[in-house]
Amino acid sequence: MFTLTQLCPTPLENARQLHLSLTAEERCRRRLHCHSDEGESLYLKLPRGITLQPGDRLRDEDATVIVTVHAKPEPTLKVMASTPLDLLRAAYHLGNRHVPLEIHTDYLRLGADSVVQTMLEQRGLTVTFEVAPFCPERGAYHAH
């Protein structure tokens, strides 16, 4: 088992390279037992305040392994609107409910939630279930 304790801003040439696919919720956890995409047993033991993003690299204390983080496909809702203003209003209502949200110019993505889906559909938005990588916006006061 490799214990990953810190971010690695630059690649290390001699370290073993692994990949780790995590859901949006898992990327917020400081402590997590998991397996790399290659099947290696991993333990995340990260400092407070770290929210992992796709492309982040983690390393163990000895720098024997570097693990690149990826967004794991998960159940999501893709929200589309007939006008940009309707999409903006949807983002407002979702933000007002503190719903983690991935924002694009022509659609929004959020974790699958039937109650929120119903609310959005009642507002006339097109909501589609998709299994896709989910990368919600980080908070305005987040520092990485």
Swiss-Prot record:
SUPFAM superfamilies: Urease metallochaperone UreE, C-terminal domain, Urease metallochaperone UreE, N-terminal domain. Belongs to the UreE family. One of its GO terms (molecular function) is nickel cation binding. GO terms for biological process: protein folding; protein-containing complex assembly; urea metabolic process. One of its GO terms (cellular component) is cytoplasm. This is Urease accessory protein UreE. The keyword Manganese does not apply. Involved in urease metallocenter assembly. Binds nickel. Probably functions as a nickel donor during metallocenter assembly. Signal peptide: none annotated. Keywords: Chaperone, Cytoplasm, Nickel, Nickel insertion. Gene3D superfamilies: Urease metallochaperone UreE, N-terminal domain, UreE, C-terminal domain. It comes from the Bacteria. InterPro entries: UreE (IPR012406), UreE_C_dom (IPR007864), UreE_N (IPR004029), UreE_N_sf (IPR036118). It is found in: Cytoplasm.
